[in-house]
Amino acid sequence: MNDNTNGVLLRETYLIDSDTAGIQLQLLRRRRRDIGRPSSGTTLMLIHGATFPSESLFDVPVDDISFMDALATAGFDVWAVDARGYGGSTRPSDMAAPPDTAAPLTPARVAARDLASAV
């Protein structure tokens, strides 16, 4: 949690099962402590692109506040998922192969399945 939140925001990290045995996905969550059960209209799910994991995109402070913190401070229940092979999610075994012999890290169709698992 960044200093500017003054304990107002709750930061949670989860590991959930994906649709593939042995692959877990990391979820980051940020929300205000003073808001009870969030509604579906205020829940946001973020997913990174093909280069960086969610934390390095959405949870890095700029001018002392991250994108996730700003959204949560505004009252949103913010979630960010790392597709397999990124951030705190499980690295598939084929990631150990040399880059010139391996398939793309996580094709879009697989990342879409990971997003569906998180939702």
Descriptions of predicted regions:
Residues 55, 81-105:
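Glycine-rich "HGGG/HGxG" loop immediately N-terminal to the catalytic nucleophile
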Residues 34-80:
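Short, surface-exposed "cap/lid" segments of acyl-processing enzymes
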Residues 26-28, 42, 58, 86:
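Generic hydrophobic, helix-prone segments enriched in Leu/Val/Ile
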Residues 1-3, 75-78, 86-88:
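Glycine/serine-rich loop-strand microenvironments at binding/catalytic pocket rims
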Residues 99-119:
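Alpha/beta-hydrolase active-site loop
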Residues 2-39:
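N-terminal cap/lid segment of alpha/beta-hydrolase-fold proteins
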